[in-house]
UniProtKB/Swiss-Prot annotation:
It comes from Buchnera aphidicola subsp. Baizongia pistaciae (strain Bp). It catalyses: tRNA(Trp) + L-tryptophan + ATP = L-tryptophyl-tRNA(Trp) + AMP + diphosphate + H(+). This is Tryptophan--tRNA ligase. GO terms for molecular function: ATP binding; tryptophan-tRNA ligase activity. The lineage of its organism: Bacteria, Pseudomonadati, Pseudomonadota, Gammaproteobacteria, Enterobacterales. It is found in: Cytoplasm. ATP binds at Q13, P14, S15, G21, N22, G149, L150, D151, I188, K197, M198, S199, K200, S201.
Length: 333
């Protein structure tokens, strides 16, 4: 089947292990989209520099992400898988867009305000200008669609505002991308505190299932997952009064590719313990297959580096054309 004439861009930072929430909300969507669109899937190592880490850890983390991409089902023949820092046009466009962005816009970003409040004495400029680099990432590939979670909605609005402003100042240069909201990924919640999103930075690891977790640890985490005190227990989806069980129903529906209503009908009378056993079986089955593939790819670093090298060359070919168009619009040589 021929691909649609549309470009997709998305990225993941090489910072910490990915979770089943990342898989459901991000990677699973990518796998489906690669068959129908021209997809640019970036490993955003420049973004990760806002947090200090050793160079050895960063390099290993990059290769971990490539192996994760492949193990989840991304095909380097169907998608452009590349490293952000290897395509220098990202940094150059970042500066050009910085000159079209207002300070007030950046300090209003919710993520920046949250991080500044938590660590007010150690805020670097990179954290403030993070959304502008994100804009250069997206706009550099004539992007039509950006799959995002709810937490990136404000950044996407800023990216579109920057693109429109540039077009008004210098002529029609950038496409205005549309975001594709991931309902599921934004709604995979912590197992231990289902009022919060499942996050790889959660201090309570019992609330998070990492893709590389030991399988016995996965079983334990799900067994300990918060439910409710209904008597008799009922497997029913209700985000207001049964948030813990609703989270487990959501997870199971994603891994089984079934409607939530189907899950409710089949398991309505199950005990919470028995329902958790069903969830455990489904996740462990997925993770067993994933981890076998992951470790097979991860031990072949030459192959992973080759994918990055070839993908970065392909990305650079697209990026050079767009950057030339931008510079011509601005009167730069």
């Amino acid at each position: 089947m021929e691909k649609l004439n549309k470009n997709v861009f998305s990225a993941v930072q090489p910072s910490g292990q990915l979770t089943i929430g990342n898989y459901i909300g991000v990677l699973r969507e990518w796998i489906l989209m690669q068959h129908d669109f021209t997809c640019f899937f970036c490993i955003a190592d420049l973004h990760s520099l806002t947090v200090r880490r050793s160079s050895a850890i960063l390099k290993n983390s990059v290769l971990d992400v490539v192996a994760t991409y492949l193990a989840c089902g991304l095909d380097p023949c169907k998608s452009v898988i590349f490293l952000q820092s290897c395509v220098h046009e990202h940094s150059e466009l970042h500066w050009l867009l910085t000159c079209c962005t207002y300070y007030g816009e950046l300090i209003r970003m919710t993520q920046f305000k949250d991080k500044a409040r938590k660590n007010s004495k150690n805020i670097n400029v990179g954290l403030l200008s993070y959304p502008i680099l994100m804009a250069s990432d997206v706009l550099l590939y004539d992007t039509d669609v950006v799959p995002i979670g709810l937490d990136q909605k404000q950044h996407m609005e800023l990216i579109c505002n920057i693109a429109r402003r540039f077009n008004l100042l210098y002529g029609n240069t950038f496409k205005i991308p549309k975001n594709k909201m991931s309902y599921y990924g934004s709604n995979i919640l912590s197992l231990s505190d289902p009022t919060k999103k499942m996050s790889k930075s959660d201090v309570n690891e019992n609330g998070v299932i990492f893709l590389l977790d030991n399988l016995s640890s996965v079983k334990k985490k799900i067994k300990l997952a918060v439910t409710d005190s209904d008597n008799p227990p009922r497997i029913r989806y209700d985000k207001d009064t049964k948030i813990g069980i609703s989270n487990l129903i959501n997870i199971l529906s994603c891994f089984q590719n079934r409607d939530i209503s189907d899950i409710e009908k089949e398991f309505y009378y199950y005990s919470y313990q028995d329902f958790k056993s069903v969830v455990i079986k489904e996740i462990v089955n997925f993770m067993t297959n994933f981890q076998n593939l992951y470790f097979s790819f991860r031990k072949n670093e030459d192959y992973l580096e080759k994918i990055l090298s070839e993908g970065s060359k392909r990305a650079s070919w697209y990026a050079k054309k767009l950057l030339k168009k931008v510079k011509t619009s601005m009167g730069l040589f």
